[in-house]
From Swiss-Prot:
Protein name, UniProt field: Putative F-box protein At3g29830
Cross-referenced SUPFAM superfamilies: F-box domain (SSF81383), L domain-like (SSF52058)
Pfam family membership, one: F-box
InterPro entries per record: F-box-like_dom_sf, F-box_AtFBL13-like, F-box_dom, FBL13/AtMIF1-like, LRR_dom_sf
Signal peptide per UniProt: none
Residue intervals of the F-box domain: 7-55
Taxonomic placement: Eukaryota, Viridiplantae, Streptophyta, Embryophyta, Tracheophyta
PANTHER family reported in the protein's UniProt record: EMB|CAB62440.1-RELATED (PTHR31900:SF34), F-BOX/RNI SUPERFAMILY PROTEIN-RELATED (PTHR31900)
Length: 463
């Protein structure tokens, strides 16, 4: 009897305490508790964070995919009909291309409004779409934002993907986080004027007629991801910016103001340029543009750059003098480990005098080498060169996706040599999922690095 009481101690707690415990679980795990007992079955409906994600309930590869979607929508309606509480914190619907479910979706959104929701996520983008606006038509969007949303004063965070709305109607003065996806925006600045307290803005896969933020902008975080910008120009006045992330084609950025003290993180990804039939700019032009961009954002404490930037940054006119010192303490290089990137890597290292952590994020797996091909690291990394950060500040080297290709090995071997990495203390190697032979090759590479510099600790993390 004592053991039974011990096992059921949690169930003996008051409902209000159980609801607090459930609030620390994901919504999906919350739902699972309903099978524990009749009491738990009712308590789970008191969760203040409600999330319905099609991907967690419907497998798009099954033959009865359509009927599964119908069941999923019925499940959502049945759930909200049982919610007894009058106020919820967050409400999320992720249902791709909801043709035929317009009435049901409207009912679900109105439920969240009636519960004075603070965080609302409406994602109707299809998993079959590309991650860009290109090729989409107006009839791809079937859900229109209900009128009551525009004036909902409890709303603090709003995400709307592939949903029709009128930017001029918003009066949510308390909104602090806004994320818009798969939409055409004519003027971002006029939209932001509706939200005087906005701190975080994300624009995903949108068509942007004009990107101009020149007024009094409070935004601390700005994310622009895979958007079409026909002007190829972006004017930004961001005196409070702390986080800036951009993914897409190379465009000209004109930063009117950036607070050097506040800027914490910058992420720059132009990898899409590798996939374009014709590059947006020549390597020299792209190198000039991206050098100016790095100079404008040089005060960031964490800097992440892509393989394309590494390739073209050295193509600009007089790259050594054009690029100013970057104040980053953590540099993340998303790389294919191609020799074309190495000059750009060295250039950035030469201009990061305060660097403490260097991370290589490998973008694709390197197969086990079927024939040995010696790559002379002294050809790729000039002899007797040691950057200021290698001599003074760089303590941690991280490689994610380590496979020990020859390009990886000779680069890392150069960095851990005692005569180069004076301050280096630790190397962390993270393996991706590998078959037995490639995994053994990676183990061998880690052991060789450890032998190269006994004073540096080499740590290998298996997948």
């Amino acid at each position: 009897m004592d053991s039974v009481n011990q096992r059921d101690r949690i169930s003996s707690l008051p409902d209000v305490v159980l609801v607090m415990i459930l609030s620390f679980l994901s919504f999906k795990d919350n739902v699972k508790t309903s099978i524990l007992s009749k009491r738990w079955r009712n308590i789970c409906y008191e969760a203040k964070n409600i999330s319905f994600k099609e991907s967690e309930y419907v497998d798009i590869s099954v033959f009865d995919y359509v009927s599964k979607r119908v069941s999923f929508v019925r499940y959502m309606l049945n759930w909200v009909s049982r919610v007894p509480i009058k106020v919820i914190e967050s409400f999320e619907i992720c249902l791709g291309f909801p043709v035929g479910f317009e009435v049901e979706i409207k009912s679900l959104i109105e439920f969240s409004i009636s519960r004075q929701v603070k965080k609302l996520v409406l994602d109707f983008s299809s998993p079959f779409w590309d991650n860009t606006w290109d090729g989409l038509r107006n009839d791809d969007f079937v859900i229109e934002l209900p009128a009551l949303i525009y004036g909902l004063q409890t709303l603090e965070s709003l995400t709307i993907y592939a949903c029709m709305f009128d930017p001029s109607r918003f009066t949510n003065v308390g909104l602090r986080t806004l994320s818009i996806g798969w939409f055409r925006l004519e003027k971002i600045e006029s939209l932001l004027s509706k939200f005087p307290l906005l701190e975080s803005l994300s624009i995903i896969s949108c068509y942007l007629d004009e990107v101009k933020l020149a007024g009094q902008i409070r935004v601390r975080e700005l994310i622009i991801d895979n958007c079409i910008i026909p002007t190829m120009y972006c004017l930004l006045n961001l005196p409070n910016i702390e986080i800036f992330k951009y993914s897409g084609n190379v465009i000209v950025f004109d930063f009117q103001k950036v607070n050097m003290i506040l800027l914490k993180e910058v992420y720059l990804d132009f990898f899409i340029e590798h996939e374009n039939d014709e590059p947006t700019y020549s390597p020299k032009e792209a190198g000039d543009i991206l050098s100016h961009l790095l100079n404008d954002l040089r005060s960031s404490r964490t800097l992440t750059v892509c393989s394309y930037l590494l390739e073209v940054i050295s193509e600009c006119n007089d790259p050594v003098d054009m690029l100013r010192d970057v104040q980053a303490q953590h540099l993340v290089l998303e790389t294919l480990m191609h020799p074309n990137e190495f000059t750009g890597m060295r250039l950035l290292l030469d201009h990061c005098p305060n660097l403490e952590t260097l991370t290589f994020q490998l973008l694709c797996l390197k197969p086990f080498p079927v024939r040995l091909q010696y790559i002379d690291s002294h050809t790729l990394w000039l002899e007797n060169i040691s950057s200021r950060c290698l001599r003074r500040t760089l303590k941690i080297l991280v490689v994610r996706g380590f496979c020990n290709s020859w390009n990886e090995f000779y680069l890392l071997n150069y960095l851990v040599l005692p005569e180069h990495g004076f301050a280096l203390e630790r190397v962390e190697l993270y393996l991706p999922p590998l078959q037995e032979m490639p995994r053994q090759w990676a183990y061998h590479g880690a052991a060789m690095l450890q032998k190269t510099s006994n004073r540096v600790q080499v740590i290998l993390h298996s997948a």
